[in-house]
Amino acid sequence: MKNAKQEHFELDQEWVELMVEAKEANISPEEIRKYLLLNKKSAHPGPAARSHTVNPF
């Protein structure tokens, strides 16, 4: 019997395909988790980094 309160989740098909490929490549869920955590980008980016310095003189 299902709960009265059910949640519906829509899966992102691209993520599903990536996870299937990772599984086929024998990449563990823990390895994926670590990769995502290490490469997580902030929702609020800091000041833009300069690729070079500007010398006005």
Curated annotation (Swiss-Prot):
InterPro entries the record matches: SinR/SinI_dimer_dom, SinR/SinI_dimer_dom_sf
GO biological process, one term: regulation of DNA-templated transcription
Ranges of residues in domain Sin: 2-40
Disulfide cross-links: none
GO molecular function: protein dimerization activity
Assembly description: Heterodimer with SinR.
Role, per record: Acts as an antagonist to SinR. SinI prevents SinR from binding to its target sequence on the gene for AprE.
Protein name in the entry: Protein SinI
